[in-house]
């Protein structure tokens, strides 16, 4: 097999391969032998049909399958022999196809990681906002918890709706004089506030009394989930049936105990737990921002091309992550009818930065001969278990496979490279 590699760009190679006639012949022999055992031809027992007969009926199909197999096998061999850091499947163009007694020739264009020689990554100057937890931030978290436990209770001694109230309503609606799906309902709770009724707001109830009916025209947005309602305007009749307000529980030991947090029985204990959690969060925030600043500073001194396939893959991962987060909230991302092209365009800059950073850190780790030991892997597994609150044995099991283990090693190498940048940098607080 003859292999020729041309550099198209820093992130693309053209690989031209010529396959020996003998190898082509052997692959054809194997393909026809397999076909003979599988195919049923009139007048011949399985495995006994002459090759000439098979060629008359199946030549194009067999040669296509053989060409595909030869390309797959020989390209993989070429990548190994030439040590090509391939990042995506090749685009193949066959020059001379499969033919008895002749070599097969094809070319493959493929994206590769750029060869980097990182420079000026020591002595970076960055600014770091130190982690800080104040009494005010602890109180703000307590208020969030208090608000999350608020309940709607009936308004007493008042019958007129005020902005911010929650109203129990009956409603009926029409479009062009005809009812539509979901136009009639009873006992619906909405907020007396600005905004569309489709989002649970009816500002027109402000100043109305229980038993009053208001009429309003409600336009549906052009991207409404119900295609039949998009861009239409509904005439709605809304009757106020009852008024409620959100009532938050008192900030006391009873609230702390109701949360059911292990070891938290009093308000003081809850404050202590909140402060501890905020300190951990702030530490992670400060570390993350420092890492981002170090990577951006290093990238500013190292310009290089990035394989488009890696950027697209990073965008795919981001969208998959968003879908998983929505799914945990019971929302199917597909049902939101989002503009995927717009979403991908919005994520492209972030993905490009992520890929460039990862490639540069990998190159720095190579330049500094960073190694990952078994002790490093064990320590990282323990850290993950502690952070996620999972048993160590479960984390070890999940990271035992070849791919998972390799991903873990790459993450540790990246962290070690970042530590090198940090230790050699000038960091201003």
From Swiss-Prot:
EC number(s) per entry: 5.2.1.8
Main localization of the protein described in the UniProt heading: cytoplasm
Keywords linked to the UniProt accession: Cell cycle, Cell division, Chaperone, Cytoplasm, Isomerase, Rotamase
Gene behind this protein: tig
GO BP terms in the entry: 'de novo' cotranslational protein folding; cell division; chaperone-mediated protein folding; protein transport; protein unfolding
Gene3D superfamilies for this protein: 3.10.50.40, Trigger factor ribosome-binding domain (3.30.70.1050), Trigger factor, C-terminal domain (1.10.3120.10)
Recorded domain comment: Consists of 3 domains; the N-terminus binds the ribosome, the middle domain has PPIase activity, while the C-terminus has intrinsic chaperone activity on its own.
Alphabetized NCBIfam families for the sequence: tig
Domain PPIase FKBP-type: 164-249
GO annotation, cellular component aspect: cytoplasm
Domain of life where this protein originates: Bacteria
UniProt entry tagged with the keyword Cytoplasm: yes
Record's subcellular location: Cytoplasm
Source organism of this protein record: Anaeromyxobacter dehalogenans (strain 2CP-C)
Coiled-coil portions: none
Function field: Involved in protein export. Acts as a chaperone by maintaining the newly synthesized protein in an open conformation. Functions as a peptidyl-prolyl cis-trans isomerase.
UniProt name for this protein: Trigger factor
Pfam families: FKBP_C, Trigger_C, Trigger_N
Reaction catalyzed: [protein]-peptidylproline (omega=180) = [protein]-peptidylproline (omega=0)
Record bears the keyword Transmembrane: no
GO molecular function: peptidyl-prolyl cis-trans isomerase activity; protein folding chaperone; ribosome binding
The family this protein is said to belong to: Belongs to the FKBP-type PPIase family. Tig subfamily.
